[in-house]
Amino acid sequence: MEGAQKPEAATRQADLNVPVPSPPLIPPPPGEYPIDLSTALRLAEAENPTIAAARARILEALALQTGARALLLPSINPGTNYHLHTGNLQRSAGTVLNLTDQSLYFGGGAGAIVAGTVTIPMVNIIGTLTEAWFEPLAAHQRVIGSSFTALATANEILLDVAILHLELLANQTTLDAQRLTERQSHDLAVIVNDFAVAGERRTADANRAQADWKLRRAAVQRAEESVAVTAARLANRLNLDPTIRLRPAGGPLVPINLIALDTPTHDLIASALQNRPDLAAQSAEVARAEVHYHEELARPWIPTVWLGYSAGVFGGGSNVVPPILAHFGGRSDFDASLFWTIMNLGAGNISLQNRRYAILGEAEARRVRVINLVRQEITSARAQALAARDQIEIARSELASAENGLREDRERSRNNLGRPIEVLNSLSLVGGARVNVIAALLRYNQAQFRLFVALGSPPPLLEPPQENLPPPPVTTPLHAPLPVTGHPFKLGFE
């Protein structure tokens, strides 16, 4: 039996003769970039492609608004035309003539043939007065909605960046805590193994201590994985090179208090309904749908206008009135038309009106859905923050008790009053309590940021930007076309 134990002891000793803390499981990156929360938020504001796309849509909406406001501005058509006819023509009285004639027109417009007007006027205004009146109003609401949507998109992305940075900092802190626990577990395993080899402790205690140390080593590896994955996700949000490892900076993980949690929930909801940009964007969509509905109601009663004016030089001739191309002189034409359109005996107009009314109802329903979402986000974030605040105190108390128990068990073990398994159990409790404190702090800080953004503002810049930093490893630089900050509009929700 003793001979069988010697190889086992040698195996345990060989396993314990490894570097502690364990070397990184994930190969080291080619470089690191330190980043604090304020720097991450500023980078996302400038480089995130989703935010840039939302702001580009504001420019698109402004372009559409310009086009809507210009519906009744005239178009200018300089041009010329040449006409040649050879062969039979029939007069209105029925007489058929064999005729060769030609004409030439140049100046403003085109399409001047025989006695008709210039078919393509030099100055031409054509448009439905219904659209000329209502489309600028709808386009203005589109601009408002796009601006608020860009704000809401920025808030969403910046919140995601803040959540990921807090998670990265917590994961790095967890990694440090797991390494500390691994080192303490390894030291305990070495001591228990030495006593077991000397015959002063049971072999089972040595095996159990070694198994616990290996579990701690695996926990360190999982923590390394979490740090690397979170850093890559944050780099994606910041449009940075993911091969450069982001390293959290800005100090230790501490509670961040942004919103006073004793504020009544209904007050928070009332403030959010006044300031949420996504709700303002949806209200603009409702207003735009209402404009389009009234446009279809007015369409059968408002005419379409057609105005044309042309001026140029015209001349021509024929084999009946020679010369065949002469008699050039100035000419001008002015034409005006108004007409009303009843589409498909009115059925087409009714169809358009019903469609626009349905779209208005859909927009109203989406606005109510956003209102409910705002209420739910405020209530949930506040509840999460309140629960996490209590969990922080519980976890800290748990850690203090576990550390006291560990000290007492170590002292008892040194005096041969306790078994090593008791120290091992206490160390396991300390390691778990350390992770619990970090997790509670992370949940509290994330809930505070969610509550702050749910009220309608972007995440705050809590610190000044880092100084003397190298340029960030941006993969494809973006330049947001239209920075949007703040929204002065009030929605009027109670």
Regions found by a protein language model. Give the residues of each.
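Acidic, low-complexity, intrinsically disordered peripheral segments
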Residues: 1-6, 86, 242, 367, ...
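Periplasmic alpha-helical coiled-coil/stalk elements that build and connect Gram-negative outer-membrane
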Residues: 150, 154-271, 384, 388, ...
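Metallo-beta-lactamase
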Residues: 223, 277, 284, 440
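Hydrophobic, well-ordered secondary-structure elements that form the walls
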Residues: 338, 356, 363, 385-388, ...
